[in-house]
Every structure is written in structure tokens, then in C-alpha cells.
Amino acid sequence: ECTSIMSDVNWSTTRAYGLGINGLYLNLRGRERDGIVEHGAERENLLNELVTRLTAVKDVDGQSVIRGVYRADKIYAGDATALAPDLIIGYRRGYRASWQTCLGNLTPEVLLDNDSVWSADHCADALEVPGLLCCNQIIRADNPSLIDLAPSILEDFGLQKPQAMTGRSIFTA
């Protein structure tokens, strides 16, 4: 038997909800079973409000907790975008969603110290985490990007990149 982690949520008044480590979803009419947020102006206003309020969150020392909040419809493309959270939270280095939050629970505190031995994860804003790619081939592309990895791997295995996939091979100029 399965128990819903959000069984106590009053969906008739919930405009947005978090699921996972850094995704926020709007309770959209037509997409969610009990959606209340209308597409159009109401959706846009709520997205803007959430971005503004989240980027204003500070810790007890007055430091910003969130570097950026990104709209899926602005950073993703393709058919799978509909499956993505409406907003992706990019935490500053040293901050993340709590373990309880990731599981759909609420804690009395807004911010908690991480007293776990786990000290690294993928909640951080991509601009906070430098990347490094080690490979045994010459990278011929100028200014390669993360979105270029999947097409590069496919090419290396002799497979065609799907038409809807963004990015390009880093191994060809």
C-alpha cells in the first residue's frame, strides 16, 4: 500500500508546491488534478511573485540563500519541458533544501544547519559550481556548454542526435 507524502495538503487553496530538492510546481488548472491557478496572467503573476520572494530570502546573518530562481519555460526546450518543475531554485553555495523538505515534510524552522555528513549535492545554482570535463579526445568546439554533453556522447557512440535535442558535439568544430 502506498501513502501519499502530500495527503494533508488542501489542494483547493494551494497555489504552488515543492517536490524534490529544488523544484516548485504551480497547481495549474488542467495540468494538476485539483489545479486552481489559471493559465495566462494569474500564472505569470504567481511565477513573478515566487521568483521575487524566493530571491529575497536571507539567513540570520543577512546573506542571500538563493542565487537565482529559473523558469522552466525559459531555460528548457522540447516536449519534456512539460514534465519539469515550473521553477528551479538555484541555492547559493552552502545552502540546500532540508532532507525533510525533499520528502514532502515541513519543519518549524525556515533555515536549518546541515548537521549531516553529506556535504555536497546538486541543489546549488550552476553558476556557483565550476565544472570540469576530462576526456581523451580533442575538444574542437568553441565555448562548449553543459547542453553539449549529450550530443557529444551520442556522436562518440555513433548515434544520431534526436532532432528535438539542443546542443552540439564538442568533438567537431
Where are these regions (language model features)?
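Secreted, luminal/periplasmic, and some membrane-associated catalytic domains
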Residues: 1-104, 152
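Substrate-binding rim/cap in mid-to-C-terminal beta-strand-loop elements of soluble/periplasmic
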Residues: 6-38, 113-157
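Generic structural "secondary-structure junction" signal
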Residues: 26, 71, 135, 172-173
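Short, well-ordered loop/turn and helix-capping segments at boundaries between secondary-structure elements
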Residues: 56, 155-162
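Short, surface-exposed loop/helix-turn segments at secondary-structure junctions
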Residues: 100-118
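Adenosyl-5′-phosphate
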Residues: 102, 133, 137, 170
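Short, surface-exposed helix-loop/turn micro-motifs enriched in polar/charged residues
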Residues: 141, 162-163
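Cytosolic regulatory/linker segments at or just downstream of nucleotide-handling modules
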Residues: 163-173
